Structure formats: C-alpha cells, structure tokens
Amino acid sequence: MPIPLLAEGFGRGLSGIPYAWPVIKTVPWIALVVLLKWYFSGATCRAERVMHGKVVLVTGGTAGIGSAVVRELATRGAQIVLLTRHAPNDPFLVDYIQDLRSQTNNELIYAEQVDLASLHSIRLFATKWVDNAPPRRLDMIILCGSVMTPYWGTPTTTDEGLEEEWMVNYLANFHLLSILSPAIRAQPPDRDVRVLFSTCSSYIGAQLDLANTDQKTKSGSVSYARSKLALMTFAYAFQKHLDAYKRPDKMDNNARALIVDPGYSRTPGTRRWLSGGSLVGLFFYLFTWPIWWLLLKSADQGAQSYLLAAMDAAYGQGAGGKLIKECRELEPLREEVQNEDIAKTLWQFSEKQIEQLEKDAAIKRAQAKKEQEAKKENEEATKRQKKEEAPTKNAAADAKPKAAASPKTDAASSATEQKKQTPGSRRSKKAK
C-alpha cells in the first residue's frame, strides 16, 4: 500500500495521493502537540533501589503526587506508614490500603492517624514513636502533605488559631521533625536515612512575614508561597542541625535532608486552585482541561523527582541540603533560605509559637474535660435522684387505694356488729 502511493506521488505529484494536502497540513500541528507534551512532562527517574525492609513515613500519601510516590516505593518492597488525618478504621482508608496492597503485592502498608492541622495530634504520634525501646527503624520521611487555598479564596484558620496553610505546610513539619529528631539520629551509622521536603516555585516571590501567621491573609497564594519559603529555610537549617550532632560511636552523620520541587502537576490541590473551589470554576476547569493536560504533569510524572531523591545512591552519601527539580540538582533562587540568621530567627519563632499554642490548647482541653466530667456527674446525680424518688412515689401510689377503701370497711364492720348484737337484745326483751 505505501509503495504504490509513493509511486503515484512521484509520478503524478501530491495531487495524485488521496488526502495528501490535509495530511501535510495536519502533521506539523500534531508534531507540535507531541513535542510540547514531551517537554512539559518533565524528566524521568532512571534510578533504582532495593527498598525491601526500608521503613518510610509519608504525609499526604493518599492522593496526588504522594500517592504516586507511595505506590512506586511499595512496589519495590518498602514498608509504608501513611500519616493521615483519617482514623485507621475509616472506610476510605481501609479500601485505599487494601487496593494499594493488591496493586503492589506488598502487605507492609499501614496507617497512623496524624492530623497535620493539630499540634496535639502530631505530638501524640511522634512521642509514641520516639518512646519506643529500642528505637524503631526509620529509613525515610517524605513530607508531601500540604494544602492550597483557591486563588480567589480566603485562607482558613485551624482550631488552634493558626492560618491553615502556615500550620499544615510548614509548622506541622517543623513540629514533627523536632520530636522525631532523636529517632533519626539514633539510627545505625550504616543506615541511609533521608528526609524529603516538598516545595514549589512560588517560594521565589514570597515574603517571610512572621507577624501574621495567626491571621487570615487576603490571598491564599501569598500564604501558600510564604509557607513554602519557610519550609525551605527550615530544611536547610535542619540539615545543619543533623550535622552538628556528635554521635556516641564517633561516626559521621548518616541523615540527609533533601528538598524536592515536583513542578506543576494535575493534582487534586491544583484542580481545586484552578477551579477556585466553586462549581462554576469546576466547569471552567473541565472546559479548559485539554490545556491543563498539555501544560501540566500527571501525578506520576510529578513524582519522578521524589523517586530520584529517594532511590538515587548519590544522595545516600556526602552532604545533604540539596534542591532537586526535574531530576537534577539546582541552586535555590532565594538567598534567604540558606541564611543562618534568618533560619535561627525562624526556628526560635516556631518553637515559641508551638509552646504557646500547646499551652493554650492544653488549658482548653482541661476545661473541656472538667465540663464533661461535671456534665457526667450531673447526669449521674439526676439518675440517683430519680431512683430515690421512685420508691416514695410508689408508696404514695399504694396508700391512695387503701385510703379510698377505708369508709366501706368501717360501714361493713358496723353492720356486722349490729347483726351480732340483735339476737341478744331480743332475748333481753323477752326476759323482761
């Protein structure tokens, strides 16, 4: 078939080939779309690593890029511990883990309830993990959990009074790693321990304003960018914190902090941001979906830089504190993230903020507990009072029928006495 068509084309020209000109006009556009799709799909991770026996903690591992990372690591045999706000018996979480186990042929996938919007929830989990004796194995922590307010939405606040994006995207990670730090440093010197932070290019235009973290900002994008800038600053400071630790065995530090920028991807968070969190915006997103399909990565494509940071042997040795994007190392575009003075100020501010918030939350929990106990005591007192009043009411109820029946009894007794007295009186009359 192709040979006769080519022969016809050489003999009679393109006019002799059916649909030749439409095909010639269409092919360049198809090639352009394919080229753009290839370009925006990003780099692919070529690294491989045996993950059998590795214990990996993951936040944000039930959706988006985090879900793709979890699936790839579980396929390679890693033991996954998902940190999620859902209870372990939540139907969604149960089905998700069962599906993941069957897809990856890996039964070592578990979940722990950790609400990143609650400092108390984070402390409960982290202290339980650290208090284990001997220290539990920990090979990797992947921090994918984050929230993003739609571009025309207003950021919300948590129950503890913090802006949600500041709390979930930054302070939760700071709090979690601050408590887990002893467990990270207690790992054997031959163990390759990695901590993966998640960032976004929005940090480039952010301002690290620490004065208004407990207030709603006017723009969700501003709040999100600020939280990512703070997280990057903390990541570099955390690496220095690990390096400064002197191991009892005199060995070098074996834990490395790596910062990963996955690029713009079609995740649930991105979809919510583009749609504005509204039904009209969702219709707009669906209408323009071909554009987002072309320009944005899929979740699997966005996970490639995470997989490189998790599996490439080069990141298991040498210095940490590296930024990875498109599967290659880059230098941060903001000098502040590596500034020691700014990092120290941020660290101290975060510690004081957490201390104050936990004190306030503890007072609220104590008050709520007292109110609950008082309510319970009142309910028990009411029940006891009802039980005590019940016999009295029953006795009164029994006394009323007896009182009502007493006149009839008296009348009957008097009639009986009269009957008894009648024969005697008759005999006395006859004697007279």
Name each model feature, range by range.
Residues 122, 227, 286-330, 342:
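C-terminal helical subdomain
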Residues 38-274, 357-370, 375, 379-386, ...:
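Rossmann-fold NAD(P)H-dependent dehydrogenase/reductase core
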Residues 125, 234, 302-306, 346, ...:
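Alpha-helical packing segments of well-folded alpha/beta enzyme cores
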Residues 119, 167-174, 296, 300, ...:
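Non-membrane alpha-helical structural segments and their capping/turn regions in soluble enzymes
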Residues 2-35, 314-432:
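C-terminal tail/cap regions
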Residues 141-142, 209-210, 279-282, 324-325:
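Active-site-adjacent bridging/hinge elements
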Residues 43, 306, 310, 350, ...:
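Hydrophobic "lid"/C-terminal helical patch
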Residues 13-43, 151, 204-207, 217-221, ...:
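Alpha-helical membrane-targeting segments
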